[in-house]
Amino acid sequence: MKPPILIAILATVMTGTMIVMLSSHWLLIWIGFEMNMLAIIPILMKKFNPRAMEASTKYFLTQATASMLLMMGVTINLLYSGQWMISKVSNPAASTMMTIALTMKLGLSPFHFWVPEVTQGISLSSGMILLTWQKIAPMSVLYQISPSINTDLMTLVALASVLVGGWGGLNQTQLRKIMAYSSIAHMGWMAAIIIYNPTMMFLNLSLYILMTLSTFMLFMLSASTTTLSLSHTWNKIPLIASTILTLMLSLGGLPPLSGFIPKWMIIQELTKNDMIVVPTLMAITALLNLYFYMRLTYSTALTMFPSANNMKMKWQFEHTKKMTLLPPLIITSTMLLPIMPMMSILD
């Protein structure tokens, strides 16, 4: 794809998301979603092959169905309240339909089936956009309608998503599928807290985006798409191998890394709201995620793939690509725990 065309398409994707985030009128929100969806399709099909075509078609059909459900919910709400404003969601049926539409857009369970398939069929750079930027618009709408969301429905969706995100990634060897299931699990944690503390959900989303961006950039730098290709990283870029180890542990939510902050705060907030069973189940299920992150850590940093002696010095002769954004992203993805005391403003 030519650079001017790519810039124009990326600008449209960003504009669509910004329209959704800054609008309080349902029609403008719907227009923003449509702009964003139609502009992302060429990015997903950047590598023009049957697999990318299939992934783009799946993405388009899912998002179009979700947009239709969203407009149906908006129309029902309009009939009952006579208002187009996002703050005036008063009808329970309309609220439920909107919630289902937005969970479908985010890829939360039970509407998660498209996420691993689409992510696996596209390039690493497209997958990075799909699993980070594309989550912002639906989450911002959920944030705005959070007072009217059905608590039981959202809790059930959150628990199912955390379970599916952990269970689905267990036997995967494809890195993009692992990141897709990781995304489903993280979205589940955000869905659990959105009713009780929507601001905390945005903190979680920010940290998730930072960690996922860093991970995808490292995969692109080492040109890895499977756990087997990741095991060659020691020979090519030793520093990257140790960085991937730290990032995986951060994604798993282990202290003293940044990924521990949202899990800690969400469990604390849910406990304050007299919900003991839900955070307990989520914390136990998060061990499944930690297991497959540890598998990646083991294959990347703790084993050396059998190779000839001259291959072990390969890193000395390889010219590595410059990624200026990577160092600050890695630092924020792993070392933010000291700012934890400042988070008291979210209470």
From Swiss-Prot:
GO terms for biological process: mitochondrial electron transport, NADH to ubiquinone; mitochondrial respiratory chain complex I assembly. It is found in: Mitochondrion inner membrane. It catalyses: a ubiquinone + NADH + 5 H(+)(in) = a ubiquinol + NAD(+) + 4 H(+)(out). It is a multi-pass membrane protein. Pfam families: NADH_dehy_S2_C, Proton_antipo_M. Its main location: mitochondrion. Its EC number is 7.1.1.2. GO terms for molecular function: NADH dehydrogenase (ubiquinone) activity. Belongs to the complex I subunit 2 family. Core subunit of respiratory chain NADH dehydrogenase (Complex I) which is composed of 45 different subunits. Interacts with TMEM242. Core subunit of the mitochondrial membrane respiratory chain NADH dehydrogenase (Complex I) which catalyzes electron transfer from NADH through the respiratory chain, using ubiquinone as an electron acceptor. Essential for the catalytic activity and assembly of complex I. This is NADH-ubiquinone oxidoreductase chain 2.
